[in-house]
Amino acid sequence: ESNQGYVNSNVGIELARYETTNYTESGSFDTDLARFRGTSDSIHTSRNTYTAADCATGYYSFAHEIGHLQSARDIATDSSTSPYAYGHGYRYEPATGWRTIMAYNCTRSCPRLNYWSNPNISYDIGPDNQRVLVNTKATIAAFR
């Protein structure tokens, strides 16, 4: 799903690898993290072998977290304009509404589209996370 979001938004990067693991979440972040540190050591081995910088999935969460690593911010109502004033997700709220990968949920809940905010793709909007990702992709690729 992450790579498809990059294609949909003309980002020009591709995530190189993913793995699945047989794990049932406990409902507690602290418990899950402790289990990863003691009983799921294969996660750490794979992370080091393949120089992974992030681990997550579900409802575009992995792409969302990668976006933060690349300096993309959540939504334009976030008062921070650093490092990119244009680098926010987008949320459209009339009627049922929708939101891009980085945007918070709508007031009345709305679907998250597998798109990065990009005024040149599907919706004529101002925020432009696609440009943030393009600007930072070489730095991220060279991370590990």
Swiss-Prot record:
The protein's Enzyme Commission number: 3.4.24.33
Signal peptide feature range: none
GO BP: any one term: proteolysis
Entry keyword annotation includes Repeat: no
Catalytic activity: Cleavage of Xaa-|-Asp, Xaa-|-Glu and Xaa-|-cysteic acid bonds
Cofactor dependency: Zn(2+)
Presence of keyword Ribonucleoprotein: no
Lineage top rank: taxon: Bacteria
Gene Ontology molecular function: metal ion binding; metallopeptidase activity
Details of cofactor binding: Binds 1 zinc ion per subunit.
Active site: E65
Record keywords, A-Z: Hydrolase, Metal-binding, Metalloprotease, Protease, Zinc
Amino acids binding Zn(2+): H64, H68
Pfam families per record: Reprolysin_5
Its job: Metalloprotease, specifically cleaves on the N-terminal side of aspartyl, glutamyl and cysteic acid residues.
Family, as annotated: Belongs to the peptidase M72 family.
This protein's name: Peptidyl-Asp metalloendopeptidase
